[in-house]
């Protein structure tokens, strides 16, 4: 059985292709390429879905973080805390602003940023902001982080690149008073046909500032900006896909539940069951006994036709461009070294799950 890590074929089925071709044809006929009605429609509906007041579309998820830092006035000489495990974009945005990243350790049960480590780093390094990551689609402990950061005036930007449809105890990711950044890269649960991103914000003032910066700083309040627009075709694709996202996320939760059930008694460790109904399950990670076991298992699954990937194979501090920064990340290093992600999509079948889990349980 051949099982791909991403299932684009079922996602972009014939019905969807027909509908999206009609929309793109409409955009071509109207000569509305840079921005248009679908940008505004998507911003309105995505904000509503995530419980936010405003959604500002931008060019990509990395820009979403960097512009958020800029809006908060964070730049040269400022220190920003990030979890030891995340995608390159989180730390790149900080470095692009001329700020200094400080590593914060993770909870070894789930890979999420640790509030206790956050408290230590806030006090030791005079952080101006932290960027907790809703990694894999899991909800980061935002309320606990706010209890640490708010009294000290430390800003929080939620990196929600993998969390379209994720729920905190208080509501959807994006419904807090923090800025929340999203990526719509083609592999995400809600994905464009190229690059696109967004920032969810609580106020119209922040919304307008983000949109101005992303449009070369042009507007009534002119400022230094950049080219970070989401083009009309990408916005149209996102608007169309938004119709199915809740249905598809529900299916992902069912897939994750079946994985949990079928992996009972195996040698891999699954994430806590408390996340089964709150995560968007962008990824389905398991923990192996060691990096060597992970490599062996990945090779075995590959031989049997199953595509896997080690998101993320290393902590940031172990990657050449990001070595030498201060902080703590020993648990992050251990977690990254043992993590393997199994295929998950809205279309993963029970038969595929059982096939994968039987291979895992055979070792």
Task: Annotate the PLM regions.
Residues 1-67, 71, 75, 337, ...:
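Conserved PLP-binding active-site segment in aminotransferase class I/II-type PLP enzymes
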Residues 14, 39-44, 49-53, 116, ...:
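PLP-dependent aminotransferase class I/II
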Residues 109-192:
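Active-site phosphate-binding strand-loop segment of PLP-dependent enzymes
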Residues 92-94, 148, 189, 233:
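Hydrophobic/aromatic ligand-binding patch that stacks against planar heteroaromatic rings
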Residues 66-125, 129-131:
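Conserved PLP-anchoring active-site segment centered on the Schiff-base-forming lysine
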Residues 175-209, 232-235:
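Active-site PLP attachment segment
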């Amino acid at each position: 059985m051949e099982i791909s890590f991403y299932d684009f074929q079922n996602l972009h089925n014939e019905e969807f292709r027909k509908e999206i071709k009609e929309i793109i044809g409409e955009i071509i006929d109207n000569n509305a390429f840079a921005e248009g009605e679908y940008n505004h429609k998507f911003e309105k509906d995505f904000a509503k879905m995530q419980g936010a007041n405003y959604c500002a579309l931008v060019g990509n998820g990395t820009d979403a973080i960097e512009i958020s830092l800029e809006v908060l006035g964070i730049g040269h000489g400022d220190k920003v805390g990030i979890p030891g495990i995340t995608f390159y974009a989180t730390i790149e945005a900080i470095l692009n602003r001329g700020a200094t990243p400080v590593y914060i350790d993770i909870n070894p049960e789930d890979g999420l940023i640790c509030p206790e480590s956050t408290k230590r780093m806030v006090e030791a390094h005079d952080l101006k902001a932290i960027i907790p990551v809703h990694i894999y689609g899991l909800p980061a402990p935002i309320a606990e982080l706010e209890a640490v950061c708010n009294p000290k005036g430390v800003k929080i930007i939620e990196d929600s690149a993998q969390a379209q449809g994720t729920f905190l105890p208080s509501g959807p990711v994006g419904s807090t008073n923090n800025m929340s950044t999203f990526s719509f890269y083609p592999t995400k649960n809600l994905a464009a046909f190229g690059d696109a991103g967004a920032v969810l914000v609580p106020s119209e003032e922040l919304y307008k500032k983000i949109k101005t910066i992303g449009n070369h700083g042009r507007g009534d309040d002119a400022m230094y900006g950049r080219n970070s627009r989401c083009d009309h075709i990408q916005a149209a694709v996102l608007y169309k896909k938004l119709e199915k996202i809740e249905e598809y996320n529900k299916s992902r939760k069912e897939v994750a539940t079946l994985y949990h059930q079928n992996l009972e008694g195996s040698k891999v460790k699954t994430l806590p069951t408390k996340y089964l109904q709150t995560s968007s399950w962008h990824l389905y990670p398991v923990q192996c006994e060691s990096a060597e076991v992970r490599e062996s298992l990945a090779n075995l699954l590959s031989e049997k036709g199953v595509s896997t990937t080690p998101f993320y194979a290393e902590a940031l501090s172990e990657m050449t461009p990001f070595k030498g920064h201060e902080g703590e990340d020993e648990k992050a290093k251990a977690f990254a070294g043992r993590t393997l992600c199994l295929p998950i999509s809205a279309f993963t079948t029970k038969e595929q799950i059982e096939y994968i889990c039987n291979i895992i349980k055979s070792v």
